């Protein structure tokens, strides 16, 4: 039997929504000052929320695909949906990340280095160790290409992992008679 689900529309809609919500979440973190919080607990919480947003949209896309496919779904189909949704969102977030780090907050990487330096200083590192570490971080500032590719790769890998997990839970093979 052929698949009736409209793959392109499902992944495009959910990928665009995930990318848009991801940007809105990043703007919210920036506007509230939580982006540079320095609190480990807050950092963990914001990461968990970010992952939950991805799970929500990828699970929704997989369920829509399954519903459009007469209730049937293979793990491979779920992975395909998850990866494509993740890549579409990743492309959107990649453009935003480049815009953010070059126009909105061009001091982003220096702020990140300063935050890490504060945390390491609190752990008791010597001034010399801190200087060596921050100098190394500054030398390895990502290029625009790396800044662009990071969300794209993360989106694809995240979609792969989430698609596999969600697909394993929601799979329902067609009868082979």
Where are these regions (language model features)?
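Transmembrane alpha-helical insertion/packing segments
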Residues: 1-61
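Alpha-helical transmembrane segments of multipass membrane proteins
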Residues: 21-29, 50-54, 89-93, 97, ...
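Functional transmembrane-helix hotspots
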Residues: 95-123
């Amino acid at each position: 039997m052929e698949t009736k689900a409209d793959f392109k529309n499902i992944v495009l809609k959910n990928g665009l929504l995930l990318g848009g919500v991801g940007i809105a979440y990043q703007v919210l973190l920036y506007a509230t000052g939580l982006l540079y919080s320095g609190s480990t607990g807050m950092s963990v919480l914001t990461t968990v929320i970010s992952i939950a947003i991805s799970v929500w949209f990828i699970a929704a896309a997989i369920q829509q695909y399954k519903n459009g496919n007469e209730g049937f779904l293979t793990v491979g189909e779920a992975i395909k949906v998850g990866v494509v949704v993740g890549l579409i969102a990743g492309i959107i977030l990649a453009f935003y990340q480049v815009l953010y780090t070059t126009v909105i907050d061009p001091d982003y990487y220096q702020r990140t280095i300063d935050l890490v330096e504060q945390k390491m200083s609190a752990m008791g590192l010597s001034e010399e160790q801190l200087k060596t570490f921050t100098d190394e971080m500054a030398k390895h500032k990502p290029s625009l290409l790396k800044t662009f590719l990071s969300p794209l790769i993360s989106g694809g890998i995240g979609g792969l992992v989430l698609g596999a997990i969600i697909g394993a839970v929601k799979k329902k093979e067609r009868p082979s008679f």
